[in-house]
């Protein structure tokens, strides 16, 4: 066993002595040592129940004849961090999480790992670590939150609350109505109930094969999630016996399938960023053009909030992720069904008995929302290395208009609230990319304000930052190269005409190459917003969004 490094041989007497101080007995040294990587944090609703969750995982590991050791990671609640300096720390926290898990697990030579994530950057951070460490691993997330209901019976979620702010600001609802939405938008523990980033990543974890069937859709408060815990411990033991590791599971084909599910569900645009980072950790050469190829062959089968009034509980009721995958598998060439997963079985075997139980929620191949996926990769002179739009969250497929430029999210939000944005405008929020932000903050507050004011179909928003999974409308993010790297978005001037063509996958500014070259020569890189601390270091090391915004290792040659 891998853990023999710290427990076998006469020279490991000091190590065993220390381990006995934690409560171990001699007989425990013949059992696999299992890292329980938890993320219990009281300020995050999706994680406040994970303390008890961790206890159940440890019980299940002991029952399977293994020895559990629990530790915790940090986390950031993107909703609470939204709209202020805290959002700069969200994406960088992914790297800290990955590094911290790598540190604990490799320092103590565990034989296997069960990861308990749930929310936005915590799931991909742990997944990156699992691929980096590459020991048998199973993921069991904390589960989605249920949707809420206002006193009038209206179904609401977190995106309803954000959009309620814009609606109140524009006089569409009263303060009492906003308070009613606030009080009921997040009714329980769990990851926010729509197809936002947390749930998108937990669903992708399931299709990648690192988590068990049901991981993405079974609610946090559903007793079936406890059954998942028991299964996870049993399956981990099998993975250890068969030496099946994350890099055996997360192949190029698995990533294709993850993006295929993402397209079928219209998941968060953040999945592109995180899954490219996973490919990097797995040592795979996977670029955005391959994502676009997946998008072209996968139909959009279900719309989940914010693209509709359906939520994760409805997806679960309709058959869950397995039912979506089973329906997708009917179309030749969409999925790679014979690859191994954390169940010890193939994807084909995992979904063999799944079926759609509500075709209003999960559409059939014969009745898709669209013939192509709910995410699109756009390119053009404004995004030479690519940009991402959640095409399934807008009915508008082509938009052209003059740009209104803001050099920060704060500046943009103030301008929107002051009425500086009107119908037909293209709002540009720049210098908010991985380096420029720093941290590539999400733009949920501006998009929600625009939607809440009733301008969601009449105003487009472009940014080198990110969008929350709760964002909707004509929102193009991840524009690469970013402004801080001298990308074309930095060269835009007020009133330049920008064209977004979703069907043709184009993002263009109607300015000649000669004029752009002239502007590039005159452009000067702004001073970094942050020069010290973690964010200062992050801004120096982070790479572009089109490569997953991973950190580059200095070249020592």
From Swiss-Prot:
Pfam families the UniProt entry points to: ILV_EDD_C (PF24877), ILVD_EDD_N (PF00920)
Annotated PROSITE patterns: ILVD_EDD_1, ILVD_EDD_2
EC top class, as a word: lyase
Note on how the cofactor is bound: Binds 1 [2Fe-2S] cluster per subunit. This cluster acts as a Lewis acid cofactor.
A single MF term (Gene Ontology): 2 iron, 2 sulfur cluster binding
Active site feature: 468 (proton acceptor)
Gene3D superfamilies in alphabetical order: IlvD/EDD C-terminal domain-like
GO CC aspect terms: cytosol
Enzyme nomenclature, EC number: 4.2.1.9
Sequence positions that bind [2Fe-2S] cluster: 119, 192
Modification N6-carboxylysine occurs at: 121
Pathway: Amino-acid biosynthesis; L-isoleucine biosynthesis; L-isoleucine from 2-oxobutanoate: step 3/4; Amino-acid biosynthesis; L-valine biosynthesis; L-valine from pyruvate: step 3/4
Cofactor section: [2Fe-2S] cluster; Mg(2+)
Binding site residues for Mg(2+): 78, 120-121, 442
Record keywords, A-Z: 2Fe-2S, Amino-acid biosynthesis, Branched-chain amino acid biosynthesis, Iron, Iron-sulfur, Lyase, Magnesium, Metal-binding
Protein's GO biological process: isoleucine biosynthetic process; L-valine biosynthetic process
Assembly information from the UniProt record: Homodimer.
Family classification: Belongs to the IlvD/Edd family.
Function (record text): Functions in the biosynthesis of branched-chain amino acids. Catalyzes the dehydration of (2R,3R)-2,3-dihydroxy-3-methylpentanoate (2,3-dihydroxy-3-methylvalerate) into 2-oxo-3-methylpentanoate (2-oxo-3-methylvalerate) and of (2R)-2,3-dihydroxy-3-methylbutanoate (2,3-dihydroxyisovalerate) into 2-oxo-3-methylbutanoate (2-oxoisovalerate), the penultimate precursor to L-isoleucine and L-valine, respectively.
Listed name of the protein: Dihydroxy-acid dehydratase
Biological source species: Bacillus cereus (strain ATCC 10987 / NRS 248)
Source taxonomy: Bacteria, Bacillati, Bacillota, Bacilli, Bacillales
């Amino acid at each position: 066993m891998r853990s023999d490094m710290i427990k076998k041989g006469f020279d490991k007497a000091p190590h065993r002595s220390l381990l006995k101080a934690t409560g171990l007995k001699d007989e425990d040294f013949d059992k696999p040592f299992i890292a329980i990587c938890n993320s219990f944090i009281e300020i995050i609703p999706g994680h406040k129940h994970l303390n008890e969750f961790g206890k159940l995982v440890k019980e299940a590991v002991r029952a399977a004849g293994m020895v559990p050791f629990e530790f915790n990671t940090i986390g950031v609640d993107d909703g609470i961090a939204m709209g202020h300096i805290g959002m700069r720390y969200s994406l960088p926290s992914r790297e800290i999480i990955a590094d911290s898990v790598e540190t604990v697990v490799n320092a103590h030579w565990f034989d296997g790992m069960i990861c308990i994530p749930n929310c936005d950057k915590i799931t991909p951070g742990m997944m990156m670590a699992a691929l980096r460490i590459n020991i048998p691993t199973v993921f069991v997330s904390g589960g989605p939150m249920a949707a809420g209901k206002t006193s009038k019976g209206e179904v609401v979620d977190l995106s309803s609350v954000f959009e309620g702010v814009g609606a109140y600001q524009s006089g569409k609802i009263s303060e009492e109505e906003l308070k009613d939405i606030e009080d009921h938008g997040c009714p329980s523990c769990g990851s926010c109930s729509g197809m936002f980033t947390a749930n998108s990543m937990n669903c992708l974890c399931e299709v990648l094969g690192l988590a068990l069937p049901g991981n993405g859709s079974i609610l946090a408060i559903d007793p079936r999630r406890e059954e998942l815990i028991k299964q996870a411990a049993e399956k981990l033991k099998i993975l250890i016996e068969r030496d099946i590791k994350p890099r055996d599971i997360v192949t190029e084909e698995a990533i294709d399938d993850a993006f295929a599910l993402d397209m079928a569900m219209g998941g968060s645009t953040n999945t592109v960023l995180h899954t490219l980072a996973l490919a990097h950790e797995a040592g795979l050469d996977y670029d955005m053009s391959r994502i676009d190829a997946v998008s072209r062959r996968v139909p959009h089968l279900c719309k989940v909030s914010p693209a509709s009034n359906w939520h994760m509980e409805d997806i679960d009721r309709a058959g869950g992720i397995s039912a979506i995958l089973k329906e997708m598998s009917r179309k030749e060439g969409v999925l790679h069904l014979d690859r191994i997963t954390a169940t010890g079985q193939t994807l084909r075997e995992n979904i063999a008995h799944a079926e759609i139980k509500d075709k209003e929620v999960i559409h059939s191949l014969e009745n898709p929302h669209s013939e192509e996926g709910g995410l699109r990769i756009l390119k053009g002179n404004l995004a030479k290395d690519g940009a991402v739009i959640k095409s399934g969250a807008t009915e508008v497929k082509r938009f052209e208009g003059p740009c209104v430029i803001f050099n920060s999210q704060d500046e943009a939000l103030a301008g929107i609230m002051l009425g500086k944005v009107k119908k037909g405008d293209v709002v540009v929020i720049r210098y908010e990319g991985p380096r420029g932000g720093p941290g590539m903050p999400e733009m949920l507050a501006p998009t929600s304000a625009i939607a809440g004011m009733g301008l969601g179909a009449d105003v487009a928003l472009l940014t080198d930052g990110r969008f929350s999974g709760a964002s909707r409308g004509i929102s193009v993010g991840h524009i690469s190269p970013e402004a801080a790297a001298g990308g074309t978005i930095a060269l835009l001037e007020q009133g330049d005409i920008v064209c977004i063509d979703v069907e043709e996958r184009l993002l263009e500014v109607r300015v000649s190459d000669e004029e752009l070259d002239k502007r590039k020569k005159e452009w000067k890189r702004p001073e970094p917003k942050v020069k010290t601390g973690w964010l200062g270091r992050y801004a120096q090391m982070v790479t572009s969004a089109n490569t997953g915004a991973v950190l580059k290792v200095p070249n020592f040659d």
